[in-house]
């Protein structure tokens, strides 16, 4: 079989269709890059290894943040020079080429390595989170500015972050599974991936956030849509967790969260008024982002406590999410794509 037809067959879930695929002229997604995910101890969060000026570092995968950022600790460690001058400055994409960005206070990076790709002459925003790189055991956030122009394959079962080209036949992406597949329309609001979900029979909107440790629901949705009431057996305080205004954060065990037929059973979800952040002192806290210039938190934020149970393919060109239950380990078809490239 010709190499191109073989690649097309790899991206079709039924082997019986390979003969038909060879005759088709539509393209399968182009495999671009892969990185091995590494779990953050004590949570379901995932980092990927990167190199910054030749030094090994770890970046947290954060799909809801708009801009890739580096920690103040890494800036000090590597002696990265600060800059506000952006003329001619460029950012890395997964092919190793670059794109212009708006002027912001940043640091200069001579070389950044992501998987098999490297870029040079880069600038990155420095995070104002002083715990990044210290109490938080990663050195930066790998965010949506490096995702939006590509298909992103989050294979949590195999612990792989894969990049594919966005130009392909609609639906011709699920190479990994015979398991039930959910095809979900996505709406991008800023950097956030919004999807419809069903919880206990009620349809609400959700944001996919790989940077969130826990899945959380806005309190008014819990009370008005699901009839929950604070300080009752069905909505008890989540330990001593409080938001930025000192209000109690609650939790509730729902029966079923469904993504177009791919189900997560008995999810325990935090219930809060304000968006989830980390407390700078210790543990988790919540801080209000419902300010005049910012929208309210989403109805539901799906965090890594649930996402790690799934295989999620973000098809940016189609504006669709392809989701199955997570597998165990790398699939044979993925190995066939990666091994010849020496990745």
Could you say what each language-model-derived stretch is?
Residues 7-16:
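Bacterial N-terminal signal peptides
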Residues 20-343:
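Pepsin/retropepsin-fold aspartyl endopeptidases
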Residues 1-4:
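Positively charged n-region of N-terminal signal peptides that target proteins for export
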């Amino acid at each position: 079989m010709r190499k191109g037809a073989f690649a097309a067959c790899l991206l079709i879930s039924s082997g019986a269709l390979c003969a038909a695929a060879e005759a088709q002229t539509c393209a399968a997604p182009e495999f671009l890059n892969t990185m091995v995910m590494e779990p953050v101890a004590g949570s379901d969060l995932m980092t990927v290894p990167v190199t910054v000026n030749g030094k090994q570092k770890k970046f947290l995968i954060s799909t809801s943040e708009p801009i890739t950022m580096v920690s103040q600790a890494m800036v000090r460690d590597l002696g990265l020079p600060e800059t506000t001058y952006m003329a001619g400055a460029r950012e890395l994409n997964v092919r190793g080429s670059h794109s212009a960005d708006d002027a912001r206070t940043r640091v200069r990076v001579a070389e950044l390595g992501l998987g098999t790709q490297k870029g040079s002459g880069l600038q990155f925003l420095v995070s104002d989170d002083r715990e990044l790189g210290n109490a938080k055991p990663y050195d930066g956030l790998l965010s949506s500015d490096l995702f939006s122009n590509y298909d992103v394959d989050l294979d949590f079962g195999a612990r792989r972050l894969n990049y594919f080209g966005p130009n392909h036949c609609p639906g011709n992406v699920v190479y990994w599974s015979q398991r039930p597949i959910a095809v979900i329309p996505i709406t991008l609001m800023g950097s956030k991936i919004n999807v419809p979900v069903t919880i206990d029979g009620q349809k609400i909107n959700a944001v996919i956030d790989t940077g969130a440790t826990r899945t959380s629901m806005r309190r008014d949705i819990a009370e008005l849509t699901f009839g929950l009431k604070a300080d009752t057996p069905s909505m008890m305080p989540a330990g001593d967790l409080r938001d930025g205004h000192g209000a109690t954060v609650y939790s509730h065990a729902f029966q079923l969260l469904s993504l177009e037929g791919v189900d997560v059973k008995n999810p325990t979800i935090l219930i809060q008024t304000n968006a989830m952040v980390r407390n700078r002192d210790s543990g988790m806290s919540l801080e209000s982002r419902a300010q005049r210039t910012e929208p309210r938190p989403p109805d539901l934020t799906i965090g890594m406590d649930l996402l790690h149970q799934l295989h999620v393919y973000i098809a940016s060109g189609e504006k669709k999410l392809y989701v199955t239950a997570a597998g165990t380990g790398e699939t044979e078809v993925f190995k066939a794509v990666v091994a010849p490239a020496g990745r």
